[in-house]
Amino acid sequence: MRRLWLVALIASLGAVANPAAAAGAKFDGSTPLLCVPIEITECDEGGKCYLGTAEEVNLPQFIRIDLKEKLLRGVGEAADRTTPIDFLERENGRMVLHGGQKGRGWTAVISEETGKLSATISEEGTAFIIFGACTAL
């Protein structure tokens, strides 16, 4: 029984480490993506930067990206937090998304092959650099 549990744990960790394999296909936009911000750096206009968690910088822990609806939405308790996708481009195996609202602008790049996420959010005096992972739902 213990060995079965260990095998299940290793398989789960492998799925998290390689979201494209867990999804079984490249991301084609036909289904929404679930993304997790893993590493977040917050920088101020003075050049000081701090590593933080999603909770510490007031970001949802899970973000649903729906390309058909052109919408980013928090998951769970953050489900009421949304932002429209104003621009979407696919090139060289990457999806590039842009948007903005309430005085903030954001950009995200998602690898269609691996699901790796790189994103920025900027507002007056502050910027966030986010690295994470996405998987197709």
Where are these regions (language model features)?
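Short, exposed beta-strand-loop hairpins at the edges of beta-sheets
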Residues: 108-110, 117-129
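Contiguous, well-ordered beta-strand patches that form the walls/edges
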Residues: 67-105
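Short, solvent-exposed loop/hinge segments that bridge or flank secondary-structure elements
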Residues: 29-69
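Edge beta-strand at a domain terminus
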Residues: 53-55, 123-137
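Sec/Tat signal peptide C-region and signal peptidase I cleavage site
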Residues: 18-22
